[in-house]
A protein has these predicted regions:
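Intrinsically disordered, low-complexity segments enriched in serine, threonine, and glycine
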Residues: 1-129
Length: 129
């Protein structure tokens, strides 16, 4: 089952992982204005992911943090591009811990809810027998 959490207010999102184990996420970021950096920080774990790129209004970025499937894809005017190289040094492809994960995000270094829309999707993982 896939769970979806859309952005909340004030540059913050709470994502509750009801799985029986940690899981990766698929993060969709849609830019409503030009930007040069975006940082998504899991304040629950201290992990963060920072991208630096010449983002344009209308760009969509899809970040996959699932183990074995890590990717960063830009969709611009219907064209898909691999922008893995935009990942900044020290960034982490974080996993969602069991329970609540509090995320804050910065666009060009400031909390911003006007210039981006963010959606988290993740699989609920259950341990087998």
């Amino acid at each position: 089952m896939i769970s979806t959490i859309e952005e909340e207010s004030d540059g913050a999102i709470d994502v509750y992982n009801g799985s029986e184990s940690e899981t990766g996420a698929i993060i969709e970021i849609e830019f409503d204005a030009d930007a040069s950096t975006i940082e998504i920080k899991n304040t629950t774990t201290g992990d963060d992911l920072k991208l630096a790129y010449a983002f344009q209004t209308g760009d969509k970025v899809i970040v996959n943090t699932n183990k074995g499937m890590k990717s960063i894809t830009l969709i611009r005017a219907g064209v898909l591009s691999n922008i893995f190289s935009s990942l900044q040094q020290g960034s982490t492809f974080f996993q969602l811990v069991i329970g609540n994960n509090h995320f804050e995000y910065l666009v060009d270094g400031i909390p911003n809810t006007e210039d981006v829309s963010i959606i988290f999707r993740y699989y609920n993982l259950y341990r087998g027998v």
